[in-house]
């Protein structure tokens, strides 16, 4: 299964509480921090809601 490399580009400060919780749940801490997440529907749904804050790359 493919993995997604998620990088936080913009700060989650001054965002809606739901968006801050999603950033925290994905394991992103600071700007420019990256995590690997599985490529599934649940992850893609979370990424869609904070798409304006992140950059996503597919990793094999």
Curated annotation (Swiss-Prot):
Matches recorded under HAMAP family: Ribosomal_uL30_B (MF_01371_B)
Family listed: Belongs to the universal ribosomal protein uL30 family.
Keywords on record: Ribonucleoprotein, Ribosomal protein
One GO CC annotation: cytosolic large ribosomal subunit
Species of provenance: Levilactobacillus brevis (strain ATCC 367 / BCRC 12310 / CIP 105137 / JCM 1170 / LMG 11437 / NCIMB 947 / NCTC 947)
Keyword Ribosomal protein in annotation: yes
InterPro entries the record matches: Ribo_uL30_ferredoxin-like_sf, Ribosomal_uL30_bac-type, Ribosomal_uL30_ferredoxin-like
Subunit structure as annotated in this protein's UniProt entry: Part of the 50S ribosomal subunit.
A GO BP entry: translation
Gene Ontology MF annotations: structural constituent of ribosome
The protein's name: Large ribosomal subunit protein uL30
Pfam families: Ribosomal_L30
